[in-house]
């Protein structure tokens, strides 16, 4: 297998070249409010951590999560179907195993456990359910790869994506009392148009910031070359009205579409901050954030086929998905010249996240039934409320040949998860006339949660000439949850919810340590060890589904998932550029997976005892439960570097770069057998060549992205079929993409940016898209046997982005 390592060999060659062209870097900035930086003379590079600042976000024309990680091969976006994404994939884990925080506040649980997706996601309910955030609101994004619960708490098993929102101080100061920024543009891949305004002002001790953004667009386009293919179930569909005449040769409703379902969507986002400085050392601030996305989808790819219980049907299904987030918060900052802290920040936030799905089915035979036609409506709602407080302290002590910078603090919070399911039928031509009663139920066990934490993180600069740096930290977390008791629960159901009304807690310590040795003027040896954990989500713990065809048992006895991460690297920086080469290994254990327990029993002492809500005990029904099962390991190599080519006599402003990630791993089953991990992305290398004019007026960048195929032998079919590959992996092929972007500054106020993606109009499948296909349910489907409709999952062809921004 020599080919996958070619980018790594190139990376090693570039690493050897950098020291020869290095020169003295500029001194680091000193400490600022709420940020302690150990003062030194060399540029600090951290293993497994990348910061993307506002300037880079603008340069890369970032409009969503896919744009954010487009040129970072070590992270990808988990596809979620029509309604968006399900978080990120980092180092072989995804979804809730990668933490997402905004200003330190955790975002919604993804509701993406296997059991939840089996029951709801497969039929189009919350198939994309991790809320996204507006890119125009952020001043900086920090991506951490590898276990990172020391900084990010529960969920940072494989890494974390931490967003930091803009502040008035990013734009105004004593010398500049106001700022106005206006930005607009278009995104070709989904016919998106957007506009955003950023306004900031400062008067006396008061400052304010407002960011308002509106986006609207359509479905994300693909690169399809085939037409829609009618689907048949083996060419026939069983007709229950004629049980003795074998199969009837009529066609099942629905088609294997080669194009995305028609969709229209709109997003509105508001960020408002208000602050007052009592003096140079005391400040109070208030924040308000509000964001809503509505998606209207004509679900033409929804597959309703005949079964042994019913003939083929084919209603037109329409959906509206709503994602809503509202946050308010207050914070207080203090600085002391002498005392137990140099800086203190107290913060309290309240957050509400709603994820809704509204479905309505219009019958295909409405033209023959006329006024008697009926429409089925279904509304599913999930709400997650969070309240969090934190107290963060920072202190730096300077000694003759050492500096000690400490960060310490504590915090806590509580959460509440509620849900609702409502369904009814109405007249097609007069929706005000119901034809059935309103069925309103709680579809999931509701729960409450609490958490608290305390941490102590230290950075030591040792020896003269800033040669040694040591980081060491510890954090304690305790997370607990309890299922809400409901008097409507039948006694049979109560018996199937152990510890109903009582708390189930997970507590433990997280650690992190790192070492930075500058062994030459421009080279550093880096080392890092860190741990991570993920407490079970609410649906993993409490989800109960008593049904004669599929019986799911709750499991409050789940243990937290855990990870250990080791990393070693070499870094260099200077006028010629910078680079970082690292190798890592991460071990995971106690993965939570949906487990088949066997057929149900009517023995109350049997763990497979499965009563229905009426008390009837099922016999022989498949029983499933979320359980801690597997362990896993991943290891790999990453390289990223930038080379300023004027260091070898080429024109000033010319630069090139390389970003490579290669990772492999295996899951270890309970029987000791090692199996592939589907969440591992194939190796990817991103090459870049760019020019920024010395006048800063214009620049151009070209990118070439090479991604290997995901081999079927590196996949598994499912947790219950570990001996066969994922059937759609055979469509994964290696591909190379070429992109081009440019900018032009017109005076000091106006900037034009444009980009062309997939210039060669390549047809390709990402691995994330292929592994999102379902073999059951009604959405994200293709024909299981012929794979007709697979081209619906191709990525966009050639597309163009454009933005214009004015700042005053």
Region roles according to the model:
Residues 188-217, 222, 226-298, 324-327, ...:
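Transmembrane beta-barrel wall of Gram-negative outer-membrane proteins
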Residues 24-171, 568:
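Acidic, small-polar-rich N-terminal luminal/periplasmic segments of exported/outer-membrane proteins
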Residues 140, 148, 160, 165-201, ...:
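Short strand-turn segments of transmembrane beta-barrel domains in outer membranes
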Residues 152-153, 168-178, 205, 281, ...:
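Short loop/turn motifs that connect adjacent beta-strands in outer-membrane beta-barrel proteins
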Residues 310-339, 447, 499-510, 514, ...:
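Outer-membrane beta-barrel signature, preferentially recognizing the C-terminal barrel domain
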């Amino acid at each position: 297998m020599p080919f996958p390592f070619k980018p790594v060999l190139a990376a090693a060659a570039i690493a050897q070249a950098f020291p020869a062209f290095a020169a003295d870097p500029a001194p680091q900035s000193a400490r600022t409010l709420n940020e302690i930086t150990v003062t030194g003379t060399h540029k600090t590079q951290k293993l497994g951590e990348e910061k993307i600042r506002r300037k880079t976000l603008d340069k890369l024309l970032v409009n969503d999560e896919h744009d954010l990680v487009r040129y970072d091969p070590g992270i990808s976006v988990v596809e979620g179907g029509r309604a968006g994404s399900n978080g990120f994939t980092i180092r072989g884990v995804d979804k809730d195993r990668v933490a997402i925080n905004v200003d330190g506040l955790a975002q919604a649980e993804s509701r993406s456990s296997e059991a939840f997706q089996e029951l709801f996601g497969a039929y189009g309910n919350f198939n994309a359910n991790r809320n996204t955030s507006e890119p125009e609101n952020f001043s900086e994004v920090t991506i951490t790869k590898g276990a990172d619960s020391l900084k990010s708490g529960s969920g940072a098993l494989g890494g974390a994506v931490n967003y930091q929102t803009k502040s008035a101080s990013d734009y105004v100061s004593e010398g500049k009392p106001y700022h106005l920024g206006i930005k607009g543009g278009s995104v070709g891949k989904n016919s998106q148009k957007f506009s955003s305004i950023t306004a900031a002002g400062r008067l006396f001790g008061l400052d304010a910031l407002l960011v308002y953004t509106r986006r609207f667009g359509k479905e994300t386009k693909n690169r399809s070359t085939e037409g829609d293919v009618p689907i048949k179930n083996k060419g026939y569909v069983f007709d229950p009205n004629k049980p003795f005449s074998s199969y009837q040769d009529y066609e099942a409703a629905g088609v294997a579409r080669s194009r995305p379902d028609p969709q229209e969507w709109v997003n509105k986002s508001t960020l408002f901050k208000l602050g007052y400085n009592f003096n140079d050392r005391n400040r109070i601030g208030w924040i308000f954030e509000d964001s809503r996305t509505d998606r209207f989808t004509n679900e033409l790819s929804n597959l309703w086929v005949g079964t042994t219980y019913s003939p083929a049907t084919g209603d037109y299904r329409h959906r509206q998905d709503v994602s809503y987030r509202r946050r308010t918060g207050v914070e207080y900052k203090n600085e002391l010249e002498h005392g137990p802290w140099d800086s203190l920040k107290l913060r309290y936030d309240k957050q509400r996240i709603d994820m809704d799905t509204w479905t309505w089915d219009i019958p295909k035979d409405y033209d023959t039934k006329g006024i008697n036609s009926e429409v089925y409506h279904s509304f599913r709602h999930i709400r997650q409320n969070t309240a969090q407080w934190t107290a963060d302290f920072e202190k730096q002590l300077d000694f003759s040949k050492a500096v000690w910078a400490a960060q310490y603090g504590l915090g806590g919070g509580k959460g509440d998860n509620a849900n609702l399911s409502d369904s009814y039928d109405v007249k097609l031509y007069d929706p005000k006339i119901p034809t059935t009663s309103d069925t309103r139920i709680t579809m999931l066990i509701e729960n409450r949660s609490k958490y608290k934490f305390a941490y102590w993180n230290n950075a030591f600069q040792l020896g003269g000439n800033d040669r040694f740096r040591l980081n060491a930290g510890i954090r304690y977390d305790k997370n607990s949850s309890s299922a809400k008791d409901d008097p409507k629960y039948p006694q049979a159901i109560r018996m199937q919810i152990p510890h109903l009304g009582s708390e189930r807690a997970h507590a433990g310590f997280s650690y992190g340590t790192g070492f930075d040795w500058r062994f030459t003027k421009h080279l550093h040896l880096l080392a890092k060890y860190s741990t991570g954990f993920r407490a079970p989500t609410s649906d993993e713990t409490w989800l109960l589904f008593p049904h004669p065809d599929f019986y799911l048992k709750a499991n409050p006895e789940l243990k937290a998932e855990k990870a250990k991460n080791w990393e070693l690297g070499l870094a260099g920086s200077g006028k010629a550029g910078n680079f970082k080469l690292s190798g890592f290994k991460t071990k995971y254990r106690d993965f939570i997976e949906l487990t088949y327990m066997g057929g149900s029993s009517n023995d109350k002492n049997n763990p497979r005892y499965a009563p229905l809500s009426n008390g009837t005990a099922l016999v022989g029904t498949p029983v499933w439960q979320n359980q801690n099962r597997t362990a896993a390991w991943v290891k790999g190599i990453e390289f990223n570097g930038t080379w300023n080519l004027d260091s070898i006599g080429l024109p000033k402003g010319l630069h090139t770069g390389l970003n490579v990630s290669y990772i492999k791993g295996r899951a270890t089953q309970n029987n000791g057998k090692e199996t592939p991990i589907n969440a591992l992305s194939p190796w990817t290398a991103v090459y870049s060549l760019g020019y920024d004019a010395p006048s800063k007026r214009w620049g151009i960048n070209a990118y070439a992205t090479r991604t290997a195929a995901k081999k079927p032998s590196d996949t598994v079919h499912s947790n219950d079929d570990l001996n066969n590959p994922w059937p759609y992996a055979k469509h994964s092929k290696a591909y190379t993409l070429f992109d081009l972007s440019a900018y032009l500054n017109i005076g000091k106020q106006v900037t034009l940016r444009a980009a062309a993606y997939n210039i060669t109009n390549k047809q390709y499948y990402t691995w994330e898209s292929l592994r999102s296909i379902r073999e059951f349910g009604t959405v994200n489907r293709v024909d299981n046997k012929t794979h007709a409709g697979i081209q619906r999952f191709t990525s966009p062809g050639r597309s163009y982005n454009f933005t214009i921004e004015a700042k005053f």
